[in-house]
Amino acid sequence: MGFVRKEGARCREAFWTLNPEFSEPQDTPCVEYWFDKVKSVSGMSVGEAREAFLSFFEKHGHTRVPPRPVVARWREDLYLTIASIVVFQPHVTSGLVPPPANPLVISQPSIRLEDIDNVGITIGRHLTSFEMAAHHAFNYPDRQVYWKEETVRLAFEFFTQVLGIPPELIVFKESWWEGGGNAGPSFEVAVGGLELATLVFMKYRVVDGRYEEIPLKIVDTGYGVERLAWFTQKTPTAFHAIYGSLVDDFRRMLGVEKPDENVMWAAFRVAGFLDPEDPESLRNYYQTVASLAGGDVETVRSILTREARLYSVLDHTKTIALMLGDGIVPSNSGEGYLARLVVRRALRQLSLLNAEVPLVDLVERQARFWMRDFPQLKENLDYILDAVSLEEERFRDVLRKARSIVERELKRKKRLGVDDLIRLYDSMGVPPEIAAEIAASRGAPVEVPHNFYSLVAARHRGPEKIRGYGFDETGLPRDVEEWARRFGETRRVFHEDPYAKAWKARVLGVKGRYLVADSTIFYPTGGGQIHDTGVIRVNNQQYRIIDVQKVGDAIVHVAEREIAAEPGDEVWMEIDWERRYSIMRHHTVTHVLIAAARRVLGRHAWQAGAEKTEEKGRLDITHHRPLTRDDIEKLENVVNQVIRERRRVWEDMVDKNEAEEKYGFTIYQGGVPMEKRLRLVFVEDWDVEACFGTHVRNTGEIGGFKIISYSRIQDGVVRLEYVAGDRVAIYARELEERLARIGDAVKAPRGQEEARVKGLIASLEQAREDLKRYRDYWVKTIEEAYISRARRVNGVKVLAVESLEKDRRTVQEILRKLTSRHEDLIAALVVENEGNTQVEIAAGPKAAEKVDLGALVKIVIKKVGGRGGGRGSYASLRVEGRLSADKVEELLADALENVL
């Protein structure tokens, strides 16, 4: 094509160009943005840019592949889809599974939060959500598709023929790419200062810092769809090109004035030089913009700061809609934590803009704006809005508690560091700016890093380990695991015929009480299903099997005692069938239940954990609100309806690509198997999941279903425990027995238990009212008889009174009421208890500001002995022998003299 290789005069980077005048590689920070002056196709929207890209590559032999969700359900080492190549990792890139097409083209919505603090400041260089358009080619040793020359040619033709860019303005800069354990050389394609694409040639695996060439060589490209739109629209910021009319809508709703166009175009020109994490770079940026626009620096700083906040709200609200639209539930862990981080940063930006518009209104605008591009936003709109509203409520609650949380932390350690700010945000949700304000008001200033939210996001990029089908932790001794891995795959008779109760096999190996056979009917622990138990007979000896584990492809049987057998011996196996059948029922109903939850609660309901045992089943699901009794009844009704319909249940082995294309990513409710073909379990017209477990053949066999408990085990996750089959009757009998015991306890005849309990509750409420009146009477009596004679010590009243009431909670309540009505009072109630003296002491708010009762009690103990303690506004003291109220009052007054 006539390209010449050069090296940048200033940037010292190698690049290829047709232009003899270029001395730099034409991307920032080597040159300023000048693409607004480049002749090209004009005015492409994001949707038009996407379609132009996909259509071009379709015409050039690529198969269009639909995008995946922004939450990486097929990956257990990553929460979010951060690039198009993530779609094909690790199964395709490892060579285990073929790609869905080869070559292919895709436009993948992606989310990256590592630079969230820079969004808006750089006028579009950084976004949290974006579309990565890409064409991929997977070159196998026996099938080469295309490599560097064809990749560069396709990029060149797209930019010149579709976008109409003059060929001499296109630059290919040499670079190097690494990520996800792979690496390779790359070209960055830039025009007019703007990088439009990256072309990566993935050919190495990174192992201990070394590069090993891999047989599968992958063309991994990434074209920024939003950047293509920005390039063709030539607006002062990418946000104008991406969001169009929404920019003015948000500006009006947030009360942000339109900026001086001279300022915005000056910012556009030099924004590529800006390093937002460098304070000096920021200062230079504002000064340069002010100089170019002919304004003063502070005015420019104010304009660009407000604009950056407006743009960050635009960006974040779209990201929130995409995350929740794909089913993420905001929480304190996993991808839910990242969704909450974006929500709370958006709320903080609204606060900094003094905008009172609810975040949910802005998210709704975004969802409706993008519905045509992302249909899931329409399908899940009710959930999206409800979840955002709830997050706003929770954030307001955090702000109400923030001062006490931070002050408690400052008492523990005098100053806060960045790690403390991150911990306060991580564990309590306190925004760093709020924590810093509170700390500064207490004389302990702390600087919040510009990239605070980026630091937090980086700590939550993905899970620490991969679960697969759930066979990663066997609990077996290491030497046994190593021994078991020597054997090939154990034939899984429990899959071939889950109803087989007995089986004859051959011993492959024995190590102490551990046995591996050529085949087995014993199910190993995994996939949330507990192992089988039973007996084996070999060489006329019977052994009880108490555990079964899968190690690699071998299945290890664990006996109660050492097994006397040799390889080749015949082994007879019998499982505890009633136990197995109960587990099969609980496992099958779990599949029915998760599908019911997605219908009743919403598509965001996702399995977060499960366990199936003989006694019961347990399912943890993601859901943003606590479950109600009505929710439980609906779930029970739906599940029991499916049971009554006697739907067929079966398994089938399906190629991974075909399974994902036909059934979506809900097949991975129980984990993501690292396998080429998936074992799918089908519940007729109801549910499809990849699953290793054993199941009944018909939902009618489940027999019945009852949820026995439900609770919120963590933010964003609810737990259901349930029984099926015979266990429903057992549970009903247990309830009857419990009811009978309650009836005996409250002395109620059979059938009258409810009325009797209601009567007792009414009596209890009356007793509480009587107790309240009694406490009020006590407070009034003390006020009338004693307050006037309280001692005064340096502006604090001290009073001690004998108390006939010995119940400690009642005494504490009396003191609380008394000191809340007399804020400068320290009051003590003295109780005689079995010849000893118990003293409860409380201080009103004003008195507590002057003295810590814990310190006061320590002084008293030094004089009279005893033990006790406390801090702040409450303390207690216990002394052997009799101590009068007058003496206690005198001791407290003397101690006060020492303290004040």
UniProtKB/Swiss-Prot annotation:
Under the heading PROSITE patterns, the entry gives: AA_TRNA_LIGASE_II_ALA
Would you tell me the protein name for this molecule?
Alanine--tRNA ligase
Quote the record's domain comment. Consists of three domains; the N-terminal catalytic domain, the editing domain and the C-terminal C-Ala domain. The editing domain removes incorrectly charged amino acids, while the C-Ala domain, along with tRNA(Ala), serves as a bridge to cooperatively bring together the editing and aminoacylation centers thus stimulating deacylation of misacylated tRNAs.
Question: Which Gene Ontology terms cover its molecular function?
Answer: alanine-tRNA ligase activity; aminoacyl-tRNA deacylase activity; ATP binding; tRNA binding; zinc ion binding
Its gene name is alaS
Q: What does this protein do?
A: Catalyzes the attachment of alanine to tRNA(Ala) in a two-step reaction: alanine is first activated by ATP to form Ala-AMP and then transferred to the acceptor end of tRNA(Ala). Also edits incorrectly charged Ser-tRNA(Ala) and Gly-tRNA(Ala) via its editing domain.
Cellular component aspect of the GO annotation: cytoplasm
For binding Zn(2+), which residues are annotated in this chain's numbering? 587, 591, 691, 695
- Which EC numbers does the record give? 6.1.1.7
Species source reads Aeropyrum pernix (strain ATCC 700893 / DSM 11879 / JCM 9820 / NBRC 100138 / K1)
Its taxonomic path starts at: Archaea, Thermoproteota, Thermoprotei, Desulfurococcales, Desulfurococcaceae
